[in-house]
Every structure is written in C-alpha cells, then in structure tokens.
From Swiss-Prot:
The gene is DES1. The keyword Lyase applies. Its cofactor is pyridoxal 5'-phosphate. It catalyses: L,L-cystathionine + H2O = 2-oxobutanoate + L-cysteine + NH4(+); O-acetyl-L-serine + hydrogen sulfide = L-cysteine + acetate. Homodimer. Involved in maintaining Cys homeostasis through the desulfuration of L-cysteine. Modulates the generation of the signaling molecule sulfide in plant cytosol. Probably unable to interact with SAT and to form the decameric Cys synthase complex (CSC) and is therefore not an enzymatically true OASTL protein. Keywords: Amino-acid biosynthesis, Cysteine biosynthesis, Cytoplasm, Lyase, Pyridoxal phosphate, Transferase. Inhibited by aminooxyacetate. This is Bifunctional cystathionine gamma-lyase/cysteine synthase. The lineage of its organism: Eukaryota, Viridiplantae, Streptophyta, Embryophyta, Tracheophyta. It is found in: Cytoplasm. One of its GO terms (biological process) is response to oxidative stress. Disruption phenotype: No visible phenotype. Light early-flowering and premature leaf senescence phenotype. Increased total cysteine content and increased resistance to pathogens. It comes from the Eukaryota.
Length: 323
C-alpha cells in the first residue's frame, strides 16, 4: 500500500466536509428522521468559515486584494467575522470588523485573539447602519476591501458548490426536506438550489424568529436568536426556492438548544436550536412519515456561554464548592 500524506497545507483546507448525525433522543412523536449537519466541526466552529474563505479567494483571484497588503472590512454578527479573522491571520490580512454590541462576549474575545480590530455598533442602526460605518472606515483605509457578505454572490455560490453536494452525497440522495435558518440567506439559497436541481420534490424550509418575522411579512424586532433574523430580507436570499417559512420563539430555541446538549451530546449555538425546533415540528407531521429531514446546525455552543442560553448552568459553575 502506498503511503499518503494527509496533512493539510493550511487552515483553509480544513473547511467543509462536515459530518451529519441522526438525532435520537429528542425526537419523541416524530414520524420522520432528522439528520443534523454539524457545521461546528469547521476550523472556527461555524458555517461562516465557508463563505469567509470563498469571498477572500474570489477577491484574490480578481486582483481586488493582496495578501500582506490589503485590509478586510466587514459588518458581521460575529461568525463571518471570526472566519475572516482566522483566514486573514493565515494569509496576512489586517481585519476590521463592525459587530452589534448585543453579540456575545465570546465573539469579541475570539475576534481579538485572532488579531481582528473590532468596532461595536448600537443594535438600533441595523445592518444598513453597520454597512455605512464600514464604508466610512473604508474611505480612510488605503487598500481596504469590503466583502459584503449580504450581497456577495460567492456567499450562496460556495454553498451550491460544497454544502449542497455534501448533503446529497452523505444522505445517498435520500434527503427529502432541508431546514435552515436565515441570516445572510446564502446557506439556504445555495444549498437549496443544488438540492432542488438534484430532486425537484425536495422541500426547503427556512427558520426565522417569531419576534422578528420579517420573511413572513411581519415587522422587525428584538429577539434572542443570534445569527438569524437580521430585520430585513437579505439580498442573497432567493425566496423562489423556499417552500415554507417556520417561526420559532426565542424560548423555543433556548429550550431546544439545551435539550440537544443534555440529551444528544451536541453543544450548539442558539440558531442551531431554533432550526432543530423547526425540524421537530416538520418531523411530527403525518404527511412526512418515513422521510429524511436534514437540518443545518450553523455553529457550536462555546461562543454563547455568556448569554441567556447558558445562564443557569453558568451560575451553577461559578458557585461550585471546592472540596
């Protein structure tokens, strides 16, 4: 047998090909099977690693940025910023990020640990306000470049090229329903498009916070589910591939996230809990008996430990007695 060296050249070669696993312990009453795609297995623990690399590589190929010389500037909820900071560090880019002040402390710490410059913004200015501030910084930064994750076509494209094919391959083409949250819209658009091209009968269900049900025609509002529900319909979301919009409350998302940890052994972020809650609803419908639902878990739980999600166990941990 010929020996093969399987060592990767750099962090970017670790991105993608994340595993899927069946949910087994929280599925009482379900008539369909649910398989979760675990994007916390990415090198920086979220699905946003995919688009961070794709947007950087595309800009490099077009001559828009140069490693060691250019500065990446982006408005982010945290996970895309973490991906950009990681890849930026490995390729020699300075990274400047604008992030809502409501995002978790862990996000700030991780970004600073990766060398990124972080500017916190008031939640009231929304994505548009963040982008305006990013443009202000760009105007003062020679060699600056904004990837624009909300409108960059490489966002959905990388999911069309990787996430969708991985789900199709690992399910042996047996996936019937896709469930995913909507942040920038890229995951649902790219993945859903690929799967529907493979099988037009596959249903795509998207998840949004009940408290900010913009996709359903409601008004934007504050909510607990970090990572989805930006308060507007993102340009990268192709609603033509969406078959159903499912609303999940912050409380439902928190409870399901906790159950995933203590019953399935999966420590995931709150948007994963929201998507799981939606998948459970779909899996209990009689018309879905025997079907396979694939739900995307976008991130791991470690960057939410300071949030309301883990408030009770955090208090317990802080007050454990010394024996």
């Amino acid at each position: 047998m010929e020996d093969r060296v399987l060592i990767k050249n750099d962090v970017t070669e670790l991105i993608g090909n994340t595993p899927m696993v069946y949910l087994n312990k929280i599925v009482d009453g379900c008539v369909a099977r649910i398989a979760a795609k675990l994007e916390m297995m990415e090198p920086c623990s979220s699905i946003k690693d995919r688009i961070a690399y794709s947007m950087i590589k595309d800009a490099e190929d077009k001559g828009l940025i140069t490693p060691g010389k250019s500065t990446l500037i982006e408005a982010t909820g945290g996970n895309t910023g973490i991906g950009l900071a990681s890849i930026g560090a490995s390729r020699g880019y300075k990274v400047i990020l604008l992030m809502p002040s409501t995002m978790s402390l862990e996000r700030r710490i991780i970004l600073r640990a990766l060398g990124a410059e972080v500017h916190l913004t008031d939640i009231s200015i929304g994505i548009k306000g963040q982008l305006e501030k990013a443009k202000e910084i760009l105007s003062k930064t020679p060699g600056g470049y904004i990837p624009h994750q909300f409108i960059n076509p490489e966002n959905p494209e990388i999911h069309y090229r990787t996430t969708g094919p991985e789900i199709w391959r690992d399910s042996a083409g047996k996936v019937d329903i896709l469930v995913a949250g909507v942040g920038t819209g890229g995951t649902v658009t790219g993945t859903g498009k690929f799967l529907k091209e493979k099988n037009k009968d596959i249903k795509v269900c998207v998840v949004e916070p009940s408290e900010s049900a913009v996709l359903s025609g409601g008004k934007p509002g504050p909510h607990l589910i970090q990572g989805i529900g930006s308060g507007e319909i993102p340009a990268n979301l192709d609603l033509s591939i969406v078959d159903e919009i499912i609303q999940v409350t912050g409380e439902e998302a928190i409870e399901t996230t906790k159950l995933l940890a203590i019953k399935e052994g999966l420590l995931v972020g709150i948007s994963s809990g929201a998507s799981a809650a939606a998948a459970l609803k779909v899996a209990k419908r009689p018309e879905n008996v025997g079907k396979l639902i694939v739900v995307i878990f976008p991130s791991g739980g470690e960057r939410y430990l300071s949030t309301e999600l883990f408030e009770s166990v955090r208090y317990e941990a802080e007050n454990l007695p010394v024996e």
